[in-house]
Amino acid sequence: MALPCLLLAQIVPKTKQQLTDSTMLRNNGYDSKRIDTVLVVGPRPLEEQLLDRVRIRPGSNPVLLNGNTFAVLNAIPSIAVDELGNLSLQGKTGVLITINGKQTYLTGTSLVGYLKSIPASSLESIDLMTIPPAKWSAEGAGGVIDIRLKKDVLKGLKGNVFLGASKGRLWKYNNGVSLQYGMKRWSLNSSFSVARSSNYFDVDRKRELAYSENVHYVIGQLNKETNNTQELNGRLGMNYRIDKQSSVELSWNYLRNNYEEIGVYQNDFSADGTLKQSTASTSNLRNPLHRNSINLHYDFAGENKNKALQFDFDYLRYSSIRKQDLKTRTVPFFSDQQEQQQFLHSNNPFSVDLLGIKGDFQRKLSGSFSMEAGFQANRSQRQSYGHYQKGEKEYAMADDDSLENTFKQTEYLEAIYTDFQLKLAEWEIKLGVRAEYAQFQTKIDYIDRNTNGRKQMFNLFPTVFGIYRIAENSGQAVQVAYGRRISRPNYQDLNPSIFFFDPSTSYQGNAQLSAQLSDNMDLKYVHGQKWNIGLSLINHRNYISMVHQLSEQNYTQTYQNIAGVKSAAISMNMGKAIVKNLMLYGFGQIQYIHYKNIPTELNDLLINRGIWSFQGNFMMHLNLPYQMTVNWTNSYRTNVLYAQTVIKPLYEMHLAVNKQFSNALSLALTARDLFHSRVLKREILGQGFNIYSKTVVDSRIIGLNFNYTFGLYKKQKIKQTSIEGEVSRL
């Protein structure tokens, strides 16, 4: 996906000169003449193929100028992100998002709300790294999307106000303000936003199993969930320029997120076609969370920018309390049993404390050779407690010791890395290696058993990048890349506390999960700014995947390690101007993925299956008079395999109309999932059971976004924090 880049040199009067230099031209036999200025008219390339990443420049195309960052990501065909925060890059999941190299410490709807709070006009570029270099954390099998902002200001005040509201079946809004004030040595920045996101889930699920040789058991389930999230985001930052070469910055980030959910669940149990009993459950869930993080950053740049030194000190505190009240009424059929009621109350506090330090050193040794090196050290501690009460009457509940648990884990992570980059004629090569040592101390207390253990792990993560530029002027090049990645278990997925959707449907973490290792290889041909085609190969070991377990009437979702997952994909990006004001962009991918696992003592999952799939994204961008643009997006994918689960084909259509009143003021009208076709149909095939489900969510949304910016911008250097990789595990 890219735009052709046309450059035109134009002579303009000196009175129109802005931030340009006069140029002297001399030809033999002619007098010297001064051209007041040479102005390059036309955009920079929208997509720039660098050695280890693809750089998207939103300012090079009006399709990416209006709205917010969430809308910009949705306008890039190789990226897929929805309102729930599910994200993929080139068809790969497990993607990390960073802002100016810093982790956001957000996932799901909280991440979506934060991206919507960043106006598109503040974006400098977006770096897409399917295989990040050694400098970046090895966390995340799907790669990294680094959003780079125009961050500093000139002397004076710069601010931004954004207002957004949308409605499907339920209302949503996201409003905020950011301010930056710059002085000679000091600069202060702050931002504040409030948001509300609401959704509903209508689920129709059918479970079929044979838990004995002669009985065919069917459970029909209808779920209706409605949730809303009230979110408050705040940031304060202070930067002091020590001298021309060094600066120090202190920043504080705060998040408060209050999640509430009401669920109604109806289950009908039948054996050999005869209805046996029915249950009706009502769940009231509250899950408030708080996050505080502090970062101290030091930056030094040597003369002529031939060397640079950076240090980061970080602290993060994350806490949540999941509380649930579940009421179930059981009605037996054709039985002497009486109608029964059961009440369940659960309280599950969870907390994470992280402390980290990171240092980076860069040195340009010669015109064609440069190197980088650095270190990272983290200590993180997470703990949770599961407390449950049961009873047949709400006022007479007693502790349920069979569900009680305590989980505590301390992790130490130390890492060092180095990168070497060399240019040889048409070749550009980058070699790197990252060494990580991790130590885990885990303590789990159940009513029936206690588990204490210590695990140590050392891994090397090599990276290799090479690009051969066939024709410099045309932009044709061949690129090859290899890298090893790691995906550590999500903290909540280690949490052994049980969450009940209803008495027969639950989710439970797995404290025995191991880290997932992935080997990634990419081969790509780039044909200038018009199109590129690539081959991607991935080999996962101990792949972390959700699995489904069914025993009699009880259905449990949890996570397990799958011994081996292999995938191969061919993908293509393109961008073409059809007429003067009409652009077409596209991304297509054909992929084969295969899962294989043999049961062991700790993992009883048996799976050996693969599937071919196709996905495509197509976008049309139309420029209209009066600085208006229309974006029409279509996406389609065939069956997708996730371990035991096959997700059926899915099609979506989106439309956006943008009006740019000035460089500072814009208004965007958006319509997502116009035909409400985002209906998730799943087929889960397990050992002795089949599950079929259909889920409808609040995906057809009409929104209006207003953005106003005032003040001056100035580019700031990219900074990375020491606690990379932790965001995806919160």
Residue ranges and their predicted role:
Residues 69, 75, 103-130:
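Short acidic/polar hinge/loop motifs at secondary-structure boundaries
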Residues 170-202, 214-263, 290-294, 464, ...:
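Transmembrane beta-barrel wall of Gram-negative outer-membrane proteins
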Residues 405-411, 486-535, 539, 557-569, ...:
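Outer-membrane beta-barrel signature, preferentially recognizing the C-terminal barrel domain
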Residues 148-163, 202, 206, 220, ...:
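Surface-exposed extracellular loop regions of Gram-negative outer-membrane beta-barrel proteins
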Residues 47, 70-107:
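Extracytoplasmic beta-strand/coil segments of soluble accessory domains associated
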Residues 354-358, 401-404, 514, 520, ...:
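Outer membrane beta-barrel strand-and-loop segments of large Gram-negative receptors
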Residues 11-62, 82-84, 90-94, 129-131, ...:
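Short, acidic, small-residue-rich periplasmic hinge/interaction motif at the N-terminus
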Residues 69-72, 111-113, 128, 140-162, ...:
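N-terminal periplasmic accessory domains that precede
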